[in-house]
Regions:
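A short, basic N-terminal segment
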Residues: 1-53
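Glycine-rich P-loop/Walker A and Walker A-like loops and their local beta1-loop-alpha1 context
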Residues: 36-79
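Loop/turn-to-beta-strand initiation segments
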Residues: 57-58, 84-85, 105-109, 142-150
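Structural motif
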Residues: 61-67, 90-93, 112-115, 151-154
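Conserved aromatic-histidine-acidic binding/catalytic patches
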Residues: 64-67, 89, 101-103, 124-125
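AAA+/P-loop NTPase substrate/partner-engagement loops
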Residues: 78-118
Length: 177
């Protein structure tokens, strides 16, 4: 693959690429390469039209688990190339940082494992952690800072996190398979 980073347009990114990638939670590979061959058309459209999409929804919920963490890293790379602060955080990191008041507030936060079935069960986070992540999502929505989430099964997330949580997602996020 040929890099999509332009040496002139992306000079500020290239000058600080190690720090930018470390902060974003992605490798340089995802920053330097296009998302086009890996991400689905709805994911590409969401990134391409980010300013418009940011104004009309709280973010994106991905339900197709195929290569989801890499897809999110490609999305973050594309957003960063367009000078948007995008960061990938596992759910446990989000919870740990939120509990200590140290959770960064990037323009776009991507969580590749908000809900993953554990051994086929519908058990998820402890109820206090569900409330903590719900708080994070509400605060990000109020600040117009979209969040991209992976949820393996919307029915199971309803059982594990409650109907109010699912209702919030369905009414405020674009859900794509």
């Amino acid at each position: 693959m040929t890099t999509v980073l332009d040496p002139i347009r992306h000079r500020t990114i290239l000058d600080d690429i190690d720090h930018i990638c470390q902060t974003a939670g992605i490798s340089q590979y995802f920053l330097a390469n296009s998302m086009m061959d890996v991400c689905g058309p709805e994911e590409v459209e969401w990134v391409r039209h980010f300013p418009k999409n940011r104004a009309v929804s709280a973010g994106l919920v991905l339900t197709d688990g195929s290569n989801v963490s890499n897809r999110m890293m490609y999305m973050a790379g594309a957003l960063i190339r367009n000078f948007t602060d995008a960061r990938v955080f596992p759910i446990n990191t989000v919870l740990r940082l939120a509990k200590t008041g140290e959770l960064p507030t990037p323009t776009v936060m991507l969580i590749p494992n908000l809900y993953v079935k554990a051994g086929g069960s519908a058990k998820g986070l402890a109820h206090w952690d569900v409330q903590a992540i719900y708080d994070v999502l509400l605060e990000r929505q109020a600040a117009s800072k979209p969040t991209v989430l992976f949820i393996e099964d919307m029915d199971a997330v309803s059982q594990a996190y409650g109907n109010v949580f699912r209702d919030f997602l369905e009414n405020n996020y674009k859900i794509v398979g």
